[in-house]
A protein has these predicted regions:
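Surface-exposed acidic/polar loop and edge beta-strand patches at domain peripheries
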Residues: 2-140, 144-325
Length: 325
């Protein structure tokens, strides 16, 4: 059933609001946060913030409130693509209105028009926890063409300028005990390993967004299953799965990070899957939002570790003290 709720802003639930030039948007709220997704294009999740707080998602000012173009627009926010990237198929113009269905008090499904030239139907389910900042996103792709295709879901969050991406690394091993590799690092043709925006540390890989610099990107087979972004006094935390027996796109990547002068993207990917006609795949992300006030050196693992230690819990001794950093 496709329907709308009252535009009255609710303490907990779903309402419709105008936002940043778009007239038709869903607002999901609970006691802690609000999440806003536009129905005029996309779908795009445009805002995710504590009440009265900073929105870590980027919205491009020159594209805010626009719709109906015949070419693809980034616009910012969070979106669903499919991998591997293709200069035509990937950039299907998603500039038309989005249908929606309410599945629960703070649970909706967004469905754009089908990508007929690609033979795909995309959907994003958004479920806000009853309390706290947690959000569960289910990204779904269904094959509506006649012939099988192999692809992966690709969930991209366009983050606000001026922050730092944080990717945890596995514990250090020992030689000769640990003889086999435990991670992949994938580079793009425009990635310069001497770029000062990158910091490849003992505990973390860090990438700083810089308004004066051009594109750079890496991908990883990331088994730890979370990454995040520090900006504006908040830490945006994204969790995702790693399936060790699965094949992932881009030489085995389930996590990719891209930045340019305008923004930074945190991107999680699902396994490569062959879809026959009528078959679907799903890819789940879990979001959290935490206060992270204080100054820090973007190349100081110790300072960032101390900032994040109360926020992110991980099994084992991952958050053991980082000495000498």
């Amino acid at each position: 059933m496709i329907f709308a709720t009252s535009s009255t802003q609710l303490q907990t639930g779903v309402s419709t609001v105008a936002f940043r030039g778009w007239d038709n948007n869903l607002r999901l709220t609970n006691d802690s946060v609000e999440l806003i997704a536009t129905l005029d294009v996309g779908p795009r999740i445009l805002a995710y913030r504590k009440h009265g707080g900073f929105n870590p998602l980027n919205i491009f000012e020159d594209q805010a409130g626009t719709s109906g173009e015949n070419v693809w627009r980034n616009r910012g926010g969070h979106r669903l693509w499919t991998a591997p990237e293709h200069k035509v198929k990937t950039y299907f113009p998603d500039n038309a209105p989005v249908e929606w269905e309410q599945l629960g008090e703070c649970h909706v499904k967004l469905r754009p028009p089908p990508e007929t030239s690609n033979g795909l139907q995309k959907e994003i389910e958004i479920q806000l926890d009853p309390v706290g900042t947690g959000v569960t996103l289910v990204h779904r792709v269904t094959r509506i063409g006649k012939t099988p295709v192999t692809l992966a879901s690709w969930a991209l969050s366009v983050m606000a300028a001026g922050g730092v991406a944080v990717v945890p690394q596995p514990e250090m091993g020992e030689h000769p005990r640990d003889l086999l590799p435990n991670r992949n690092l994938v580079l793009w043709p425009y990635t310069d390993m001497s770029d000062s925006r990158w910091h490849f540390g003992k505990k973390y890989i860090l990438l700083r967004q810089d308004a004066t610099r051009g594109p750079t990107k890496i991908g990883l087979s990331h088994q730890i299953g979370w990454s995040g972004y520090l900006v504006g006094g908040v830490f945006f935390l994204k969790r995702y799965a790693w399936e060790p027996e699965a094949s992932y796109p881009d030489n085995g990547c389930n996590l990719e990070i891209f930045t340019n002068a305008r923004m930074l993207e945190l991107e999680s990917l699902g396994p490569l899957t062959e879809l026959g006609s009528g078959e679907s795949l799903e890819h789940v992300e879990r979001w959290e939002l935490h206060d992270a006030h204080g100054t820090f050196d973007v190349k100081s693992e110790h300072q960032i570790h101390q900032l994040l230690q109360p926020i992110v819990s991980a099994p084992g001794s991952y958050f053991a003290k980082v000495d000498g950093h």
